[in-house]
């Protein structure tokens, strides 16, 4: 078989952004359509895209805060309206936009009385605060507030460790999820065999990226997951008996095992399980109780050995012999070697 390089979609699919708006600095909305799709394809794409949008896109957030002379997370500081815990929760909500990789340091250093907001965060040039008005703390007295911050790019949700650091730093639940929500719906049109579908995809983001950017990144991530299958070569699959990495999927014997009879030497017999056979439930259960799970296990026994199995009858042995002869051209010896 000649393998052709896949250069793109073979169908004339078109996508379009039909609605886009910014409800606030931290809430963007986009609505997209993809068509024409065959029946069932819209749901397949919609489910995959939603999972990729919610779980595969990286985001940047504050993961740790450090301040001196703070005994514990639930303590209060004179001259600050919020407790340390409330300040950490406010830092958790800060939305950042960046393309950094790894960990970066940032800081807050202000003097009261004043209101501390995200605008007061001193961050690297590669990090941008999406909404500078986000509240962090209220200083009610002329005191200094200095907080060291750790910024990290990741994906998904990572809970903080419960143990506080000895150096006065406190971990923050990392919510690296730029997409706040994603939904898909399907519109069908046409009649009979000509029925087609339109996929509607709705995306809400936190402002660190637009819905269109999120759609592009999710699509790239999905493509990256499937690329290995495009380059997989069938001849690389090894069926040697000494490698127990390949399991023959369940199949019915009359049709699928016809080919197995011709190629029995190429397939690891220990990877063919007896539950893939046509053996009656009673015979199957007796074999399992005797720790006979694979075809290789079965062939390691003689007819005499099988007759020693508890509750095993001569009819059961005959059934096994018929199955082996019919589908594998294999016979069991009457006695042990």
Curated annotation (Swiss-Prot):
Renumbered residue ranges of the record's region Alpha C-terminal domain (alpha-CTD): 265-337
Designated name of the protein: DNA-directed RNA polymerase subunit alpha
NCBIfam families: rpoA
Species whose genome carries this gene: Acorus gramineus
CDD domains, per the entry: RNAP_alpha_NTD (cd06928)
Gene Ontology CC entries for this record: chloroplast; DNA-directed RNA polymerase complex; mitochondrion
Main location: plastid
UniProt keyword Chloroplast present: yes
Swiss-Prot/TrEMBL domain comment: The N-terminal domain is essential for RNAP assembly and basal transcription, whereas the C-terminal domain is involved in interaction with transcriptional regulators and with upstream promoter elements.
């Amino acid at each position: 078989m000649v393998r052709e390089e896949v250069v793109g979609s073979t169908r004339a699919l078109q996508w379009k952004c039909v609605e886009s708006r910014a409800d606030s600095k931290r809430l963007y909305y986009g609505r997209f359509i993809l068509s024409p799709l065959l029946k069932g394809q819209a749901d397949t794409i919609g489910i995959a895209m939603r999972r990729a949008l919610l779980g595969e896109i990286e985001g940047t957030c504050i993961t740790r805060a450090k301040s001196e002379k703070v005994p514990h997370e639930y303590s209060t500081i004179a001259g600050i309206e919020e407790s340390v815990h409330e300040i950490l929760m406010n830092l958790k909500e800060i939305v950042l936009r960046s393309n950094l990789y790894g960990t970066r340091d940032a800081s807050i250093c202000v003097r009261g009385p004043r209101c501390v907001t995200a605008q007061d965060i001193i961050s690297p040039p590669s990090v941008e605060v999406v909404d500078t008005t986000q509240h962090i703390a209220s200083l009610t007295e002329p005191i200094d507030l200095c907080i060291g911050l750790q910024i990290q790019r990741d994906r998904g949700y990572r809970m903080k460790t419960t143990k506080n650091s000895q150096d006065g730093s406190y971990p923050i639940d990392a919510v690296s999820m730029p997409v706040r929500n994603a939904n898909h719906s399907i519109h069908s049109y046409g009649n009979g065999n000509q029925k087609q579908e339109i996929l509607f995809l709705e995306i809400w983001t936190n402002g660190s990226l637009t819905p269109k950017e999120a759609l592009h990144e999710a699509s790239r991530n999905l493509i990256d997951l499937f690329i290995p299958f495009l380059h997989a070569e069938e001849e690389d699959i090894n069926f040697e008996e000494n490698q127990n990495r390949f399991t023959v999927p369940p199949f019915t014997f009359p049709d699928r095992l016809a080919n197995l009879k011709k190629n029995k030497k190429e397939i690891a017999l220990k990877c063919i399980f007896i539950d893939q056979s046509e053996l009656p439930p009673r015979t199957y259960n007796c074999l399992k109780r005797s720790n006979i799970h694979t075809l290789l296990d079965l062939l390691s026994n003689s007819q005499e050995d099988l007759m020693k199995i508890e509750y095993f009858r001569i009819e059961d042995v005959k059934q096994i012999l018929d199955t082996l002869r019919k589908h594998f051209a294999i016979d069991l010896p009457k006695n042990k070697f």
